[in-house]
C-alpha cells in the first residue's frame, strides 16, 4: 500500500514540474501542411428514401472555404444511407392486360451497380398480407424487379422483396400488394373521369330521359278532374264557414235577449 502511494506521488511530481513545452511547427512544416488537401462535410442532404437503402448527397469543401455548392473548390458526393430496412405494405390496382413493373431498388441499383446486392422475391397468391408464412419463392426474370406483361388475374396477390448487401446484411424488405380488375368492372382512367365530372350537363346524365313521363291525354284528364274537384272543395269550405258564422250570430242574439 505504501509503495503504491509513493509511486503515485512521484507521477504527480513529474507531471507538475516537468520542463516539457509544446513544440512549434517550422515554416517548412507549415508549407507542407498547406499542401495537404483536407476535406470536410460542410452540408448533408436528407436520405432519398424513408425506408430501405437510399442515396445521400453530401457537400465536401476544403478547410477554410465557405459553404457554397457553386464554389469550384467544393464538390458533391453520393453515398448510401439506411434509416430502416422495413418498408411495410403498399398496394396498387391495375386492370388486366396492362404492363406492371414492381421495382425493388429503383435508383440505388443504377448508382451502386447490379452486383452490389442480392435480391430475392416471394409471392402470396390472391391475398394482401404481410404474414411471411404465406409466401412461396417467386422466380423473377429480372433480379431487381418483377415485370408483369401482360397482367393477368392470376398475378393478383402480395409480392415480397428482400435485399441483402455484399456482407449478407438485410437492407430492405418491401411488400407490394397487387389487385387485378377486369376492364369491364371498373375504369381507372382518372383523367377521363375528371373531364366527365367537370362538364355540368354530364353530371346528371343518367337522370334525364328522352321520353315524357306522362302522355298528353293523361295530363288532360288530370286537369279535367282536378278543376271540378277543387271547385267542390272550395264550395264545401264556404258553406261550412257560412253556417258557422250564422250560428255564432244566433247565439249572440240569444244572449242579448236573456239580458
UniProtKB/Swiss-Prot annotation:
GO terms (BP aspect): sperm-egg recognition
Membrane topology: Single-pass type I membrane protein
Coiled coil: none
Position of the signal peptide: 1-18
Chief location category: membrane
Cell location: Cell membrane
Disruption phenotype: Mutants develop normally into adult males and females. Male mutants are sterile, whereas females show normal fertility.
SUPFAM superfamilies, alphabetized: Immunoglobulin
Function statement: Essential fertilization factor required for male fertility. Part of a conserved trimeric sperm complex with the essential fertilization factors IZUMO1 and SPACA6 which bridges sperm and oocyte membranes during fertilization by binding to IZUMO1R/JUNO on the oocyte.
Self-association state and partner proteins as the record states: Forms a complex with izumo1 and spaca6 on spermatocyte cell membrane. The complex binds to oocyte protein bncr.
This protein's name: Transmembrane protein 81
Organism annotation: Danio rerio
Amino acid at each position: 500500500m505504501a509503495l503504491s502511494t509513493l509511486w503515485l506521488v512521484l507521477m504527480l511530481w513529474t507531471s507538475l514540474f516537468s520542463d516539457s513545452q509544446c513544440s512549434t511547427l517550422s515554416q517548412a512544416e507549415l508549407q507542407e501542411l498547406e499542401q495537404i488537401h483536407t476535406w470536410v462535410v460542410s452540408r448533408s442532404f436528407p436520405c432519398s428514401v424513408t425506408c430501405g437503402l437510399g442515396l445521400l448527397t453530401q457537400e465536401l469543401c476544403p478547410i477554410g472555404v465557405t459553404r457554397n455548392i457553386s464554389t469550384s473548390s467544393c464538390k458533391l458526393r453520393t453515398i448510401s444511407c439506411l434509416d430502416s430496412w422495413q418498408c411495410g405494405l403498399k398496394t396498387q390496382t391495375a386492370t388486366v392486360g396492362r404492363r406492371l413493373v414492381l421495382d425493388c431498388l429503383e435508383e440505388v441499383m443504377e448508382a451502386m451497380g447490379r452486383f452490389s446486392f442480392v435480391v430475392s422475391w416471394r409471392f402470396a397468391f390472391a391475398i394482401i398480407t404481410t404474414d411471411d408464412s404465406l409466401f412461396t419463392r417467386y422466380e423473377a426474370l429480372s433480379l431487381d424487379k418483377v415485370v408483369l406483361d401482360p397482367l393477368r388475374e392470376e398475378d393478383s396477390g402480395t409480392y415480397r422483396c428482400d435485399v441483402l448487401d455484399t456482407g449478407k446484411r438485410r437492407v430492405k424488405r418491401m411488400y407490394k400488394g397487387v389487385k387485378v380488375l377486369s376492364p369491364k368492372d371498373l375504369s381507372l382512367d382518372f383523367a377521363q373521369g375528371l373531364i366527365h365530372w367537370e362538364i355540368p350537363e354530364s353530371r346528371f346524365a343518367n337522370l334525364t330521359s328522352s321520353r315524357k313521363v306522362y302522355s298528353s291525354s293523361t295530363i288532360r284528364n288530370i286537369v279535367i278532374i282536378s278543376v271540378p274537384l277543387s271547385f267542390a272543395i272550395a264550395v264545401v269550405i264556404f258553406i261550412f264557414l257560412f253556417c258557422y258564422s250564422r250560428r255564432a250570430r244566433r247565439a249572440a242574439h240569444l244572449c242579448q235577449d236573456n239580458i
